[in-house]
Amino acid sequence: MARTKQTARKSTGVKAPRKQLATKAARKSAPVSGGVKKPHKFRPGTVALREIRKYQKTTDLLIRKLPFQRLVRDIAMEMKNDIRFQSQAILALQEAAEAYLVGLFEDTNLCAIHARRVTIMTKDMQLARRIRGERF
């Protein structure tokens, strides 16, 4: 049965209490087995769609700042030992890296949809990078 939207109604007064059936009364008085309420389970994909909408609304950075900063410094150490970064430079690198990754995942998703799939695979990412003209 389809769900319908319920609207508020005016109450016309107090109704007389009804007599409960014996089975309902027995059910209410019986103790709940275990006493632990099971957590609510959402259908597969519901939480994923909610997360997609949430992250599409926000403009903040998705990668944590300190781990990204450590990664940048680690990569820079391989090129030169004593290199310093302004905080704005690391933020600019992070913005650029996240913009690149978001675009790559969008193209990867289009490749998966083109192959009549909804799940992205490594071959989709390889195809997206190849079409873009990037090296492996």
Swiss-Prot record:
InterPro entries named among the record's database cross-references: Histone-fold, Histone_H2A/H2B/H3, Histone_H3/CENP-A
SUPFAM superfamilies documented for this protein: Histone-fold (SSF47113)
Subcellular location: Nucleus; Chromosome
GO CC terms in record: nucleosome; nucleus
Molecular function (Gene Ontology), one example: DNA binding
Domain of life: Eukaryota
PROSITE patterns: HISTONE_H3_1, HISTONE_H3_2
PTM characteristics: Acetylated. Acetylation occurs almost exclusively in the MAC.
Keyword DNA-binding attributed: yes
Ranges for region Disordered: 1-41
Keyword DNA-binding: yes
This protein's UniProt keywords: Chromosome, DNA-binding, Nucleosome core, Nucleus
Quaternary structure note: The nucleosome is a histone octamer containing two molecules each of H2A, H2B, H3 and H4 assembled in one H3-H4 heterotetramer and two H2A-H2B heterodimers. The octamer wraps approximately 147 bp of DNA.
Function in brief: Macronuclear replacement variant which replaces conventional H3 in a subset of nucleosomes. Nucleosomes wrap and compact DNA into chromatin, limiting DNA accessibility to the cellular machineries which require DNA as a template. Histones thereby play a central role in transcription regulation, DNA repair, DNA replication and chromosomal stability. DNA accessibility is regulated via a complex set of post-translational modifications of histones, also called histone code, and nucleosome remodeling. Functions redundantly to H3.4.
Similarity field: Belongs to the histone H3 family.
Protein name from the UniProt record: Histone H3.3
Organism listed in the record: Tetrahymena pyriformis
